[in-house]
């Protein structure tokens, strides 16, 4: 179980100012979270492969293909500033 002093220490380390009321609230909430974690640690996971998510996710990518865009000038007309056939953007890196 977590106590108020531990909550105050965590708040101090995180550079957070919390009121007495918040200290009490966080003590209860963090205590409940830690109790739940302790409960989860009792679950038998023998034979269960390690995983990072409940549902297996696979990236779906499309093959790269060159596509010629017919209305280049139409897009460039909307550019706030342009240099020849390119959008001109503010410099973000120094020389």
Swiss-Prot record:
UniProt key word ATP-binding: yes
**Protein name listed in UniProt:** Aspartyl/glutamyl-tRNA(Asn/Gln) amidotransferase subunit C
| Role summary | Allows the formation of correctly charged Asn-tRNA(Asn) or Gln-tRNA(Gln) through the transamidation of misacylated Asp-tRNA(Asn) or Glu-tRNA(Gln) in organisms which lack either or both of asparaginyl-tRNA or glutaminyl-tRNA synthetases. The reaction takes place in the presence of glutamine and ATP through an activated phospho-Asp-tRNA(Asn) or phospho-Glu-tRNA(Gln).
Under Pfam families, the record lists: GatC (PF02686)
Q: What is its EC number?
A: 6.3.5.-
Biological classification of the source: Bacteria, Bacillati, Cyanobacteriota, Cyanophyceae, Gloeobacterales
The UniProt keywords, alphabetically, are: ATP-binding, Ligase, Nucleotide-binding, Protein biosynthesis
GO terms for biological process, alphabetical: glutaminyl-tRNAGln biosynthesis via transamidation; regulation of translational fidelity; translation
Class in the EC hierarchy, top level: ligase
SUPFAM superfamilies per record: Glu-tRNAGln amidotransferase C subunit (SSF141000)
Q: Superkingdom of this entry's organism? A: Bacteria
| Subunit composition and interactions | Heterotrimer of A, B and C subunits.
Record flagged with keyword Phosphoprotein: no
> What is a GO molecular function of this protein?
glutaminyl-tRNA synthase (glutamine-hydrolyzing) activity
Annotated catalysed reactions: L-glutamyl-tRNA(Gln) + L-glutamine + ATP + H2O = L-glutaminyl-tRNA(Gln) + L-glutamate + ADP + phosphate + H(+); L-aspartyl-tRNA(Asn) + L-glutamine + ATP + H2O = L-asparaginyl-tRNA(Asn) + L-glutamate + ADP + phosphate + 2 H(+)
PANTHER family, alphabetized:
GLUTAMYL-TRNA(GLN) AMIDOTRANSFERASE SUBUNIT C, MITOCHONDRIAL (PTHR15004:SF0)
| Protein family (similarity comment) | Belongs to the GatC family.
